[in-house]
């Protein structure tokens, strides 16, 4: 039986057509003030495709960043694992922006139907990823992050797998979002792609999965004063180490080769990169594109 036929249709967001409709300004302010802050009424929405994130003005203090998690995407245990990973990284003096904790040490809160968290506001801009010195610095930092990530595994958060990112994504798109005239071509092409992806993964023996950022592109890195602040661990999963490296590369093949050399040189100062994972860059890129298409489909409403 074809693997695409074995996978049940993933659950969509039909039950919650617009999960964020209730996030009115008064709701947002009430949520933040429930934690003991006094808001000054200033609210500024920030870019976030999956959750809802706002800069919230605080009386006589620096604004805070409030993140409201999309209902039914992550469980409470999964979100707490994300937070705990950030706290572990901060304990090792890594430049990560962790959730704010109250006096009881709590970082995840509930208001209405939403889990939410607060974060300290950090300034910065996307790093220049064509600058080799920047890439060396990012490689060193990522090596340190992965040294912490490899200490233990996530118990609740999933892994990046061919089944989840590949076959499940194709099943959703093929069943609901492709015109009939294109369906056969789409399924044929994606079947060939996934066969090639599986072949590449099969050639990497003893592949180790570690806790990773999962979505480490320039938009999730705030660059300031010649260093980086890593933000948004919302997509943290178990994954090969190279998952957090390949999205730092840009340009043509010679440029990416030079960039990768800098990243890996810095990385190896703190954690060993296994060259066998290099053959997974294109398979992981393919899985990301398939997964992204399905992610857009699930958010269609």
Predicted regions, residues:
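Conserved NTP-binding catalytic cores of kinases and kinase-like/nucleotidyltransferase enzymes
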Residues: 1-103, 225-227
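Active-site catalytic-loop/activation-segment of kinase and kinase-like phosphoryl-transfer enzymes
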Residues: 1-9, 19, 158-202
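Active-site acidic catalytic loop and adjacent metal/ATP-binding pocket
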Residues: 50-66, 99, 198-245
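ATP-binding pocket architecture of kinase catalytic cores
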Residues: 58-154
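A glycine-centered beta->alpha junction motif in the catalytic cores
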Residues: 71, 114-129, 170-178, 292-301
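Activation segment
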Residues: 71, 124, 228, 236-238, ...
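A cross-family kinase active-site recognition segment
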Residues: 128-185, 209
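Active-site activation/catalytic loop segments of kinase-like enzymes and analogous catalytic loops
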Residues: 241-272, 288-301
């Amino acid at each position: 039986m074809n693997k695409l036929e074995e996978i049940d249709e993933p659950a969509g967001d039909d039950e919650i057509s617009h999960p964020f409709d209730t996030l009115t300004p008064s709701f947002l302010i009430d949520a933040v003030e429930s934690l003991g802050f006094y808001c000054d009424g200033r609210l500024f929405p920030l870019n976030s495709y999956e959750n809802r994130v706002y800069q919230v003005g605080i009386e006589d203090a620096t604004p805070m960043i409030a993140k409201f998690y999309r209902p039914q995407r992550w469980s409470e245990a999964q979100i707490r694992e994300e937070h705990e990973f950030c706290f572990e990284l901060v304990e090792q003096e890594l430049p990560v922006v962790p959730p704010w904790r109250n006096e009881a040490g709590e970082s995840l809160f509930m208001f209405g139907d939403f889990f939410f968290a607060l974060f300290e506001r950090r300034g910065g801009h996307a790093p220049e990823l064509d600058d080799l010195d920047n890439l060396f610095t990012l490689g060193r930092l990522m090596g340190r992050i992965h040294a912490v990530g490899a200490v233990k595994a996530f118990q609740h958060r999933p892994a990046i797998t061919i089944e989840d990112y590949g076959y499940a994504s194709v099943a959703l798109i093929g069943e609901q979002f492709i015109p009939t005239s294109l369906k056969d071509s789409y399924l044929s092409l994606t079947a060939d792609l996934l066969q090639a992806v599986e072949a590449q993964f099969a050639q990497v023996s003893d592949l180790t999965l570690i806790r990773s950022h999962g979505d480490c592109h320039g938009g999730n890195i705030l660059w300031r004063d010649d260093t980086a602040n890593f933000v948004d661990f919302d997509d943290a999963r178990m994954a090969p180490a190279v998952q957090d490296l390949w999205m730092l590369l840009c340009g043509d093949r010679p440029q990416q080769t030079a960039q990768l050399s800098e990243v890996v040189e810095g990385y190896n100062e703190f954690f060993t990169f296994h060259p066998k994972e290099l053959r997974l860059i294109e398979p992981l890129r393919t899985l990301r594109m398939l997964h992204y298409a399905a992610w857009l489909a699930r958010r269609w409403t």
